[in-house]
């Protein structure tokens, strides 16, 4: 079963949940999760917790424990917060390049689902009649301790956007599209740029490249073994290392080049 994860303490999450139930024919099941009724449609479940999702390590195990169902994939429907309050529709995988400041474990990564994130990006871009920014975010926050592929799809970045009905509809439709469609793309690990990964976003929207984990400039430098770990945490094989050259530190550029040669991966310099 495929799982859409929501939380009661997140207004964007509840907005998206409401639109999923209203617009896509989800019905109450006889299951509960964390004391909340589970909704279902075909092979998709909507689960709701009462906690912050970013701190929910081992969620896949908890879902199996409470529902007796092993999830194939988890899509987190969430808010995105930023001081700049940029109206945005974003997607990313979770994990920590260094210290775990907001959930997860240090230097640990969830399993990326590159094709799903790319499909989410393309669908949000197509549906975006709000004029908001549509983008990847770099890999950040928890949960990192999950053994099934997962991704966050978010409404940002302030309460005004979180409760916007149209944004809720766009994300609900995007989630359903991602869970129903299967498409394969060439996969790259992304290195460089700011938190909103502008170059990686542009490349994903305009070419056949999909990204797994994205290492932003602010998280550099990182150790070789951390990049190797990120490379291994993808449900689809990573074939390339993509570097936003100006948006990366010198030592990280060099390390990326060396790793690509060592592992026989394509090196893409942008």
From Swiss-Prot:
Gene Ontology MF: a single term: zinc ion binding
Catalytic activity from the UniProt record: a D-aminoacyl-tRNA + H2O = a tRNA + a D-alpha-amino acid + H(+); glycyl-tRNA(Ala) + H2O = tRNA(Ala) + glycine + H(+)
EC number: 3.1.1.96
InterPro entries to which the protein is assigned, alphabetical: Deacylase_DtdA_archaea, DtdA
Cofactor: Zn(2+)
Tree of life domain: Archaea
Record SUPFAM superfamilies: AF0625-like
Cofactor: binding details: Binds 2 Zn(2+) ions per subunit.
Keyword Hydrolase appears in the UniProt entry: yes
Any one Gene Ontology BP term: D-amino acid catabolic process
Keywords from the named record: Hydrolase, Metal-binding, Zinc
Pfam families: tRNA_deacylase (PF04414)
Family according to the record: Belongs to the DtdA deacylase family.
Function: D-aminoacyl-tRNA deacylase with broad substrate specificity. By recycling D-aminoacyl-tRNA to D-amino acids and free tRNA molecules, this enzyme counteracts the toxicity associated with the formation of D-aminoacyl-tRNA entities in vivo.
Subunit structure as annotated in this protein's UniProt entry: Monomer.
HAMAP family, per the entry: Deacylase_DtdA (MF_00562)
Protein's UniProt name: D-aminoacyl-tRNA deacylase
Organism placement in taxonomy: Archaea, Methanobacteriati, Methanobacteriota, Thermococci, Thermococcales
Gene: dtdA
């Amino acid at each position: 079963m495929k799982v859409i994860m929501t939380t009661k303490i997140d207004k964007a999450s509840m907005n998206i949940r409401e639109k999923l139930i209203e617009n896509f024919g989800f019905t109450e099941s006889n299951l509960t999760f964390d004391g909340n009724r589970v909704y279902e449609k075909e092979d998709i479940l909507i689960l709701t917790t009462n906690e912050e999702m970013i701190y929910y390590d081992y969620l896949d195990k908890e879902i199996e424990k409470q529902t007796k169902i092993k999830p194939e994939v988890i899509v987190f429907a969430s808010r995105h917060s930023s001081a700049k309050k940029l109206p945005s529709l974003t997607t990313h995988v979770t994990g920590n390049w260094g210290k775990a400041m907001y959930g997860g474990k240090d230097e640990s990564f969830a399993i990326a689902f590159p094709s799903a994130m790319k499909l989410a990006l393309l669908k949000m871009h197509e549906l975006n009649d709000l004029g908001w920014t549509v983008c990847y975010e770099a890999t950040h926050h928890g949960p990192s301790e999950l053994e099934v592929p997962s991704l966050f799809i978010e409404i940002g970045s302030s309460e005004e956007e979180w409760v916007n009905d149209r944004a809720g509809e766009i994300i609900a439709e995007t989630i359903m599209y991602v869970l129903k469609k299967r498409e394969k793309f060439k996969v790259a690990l992304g290195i460089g740029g700011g938190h909103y990964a502008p170059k990686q976003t542009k490349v994903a929207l305009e070419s056949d490249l999909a990204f797994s984990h994205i290492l932003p400039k602010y998280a550099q430098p990182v150790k070789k073994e951390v990049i190797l770990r990120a490379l291994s945490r993808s449900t689809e094989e990573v074939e390339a290392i993509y570097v936003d050259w100006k948006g990366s530190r010198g030592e990280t550029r060099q390390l990326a080049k060396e790793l690509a040669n060592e592992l026989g991966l394509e090196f893409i310099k942008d």
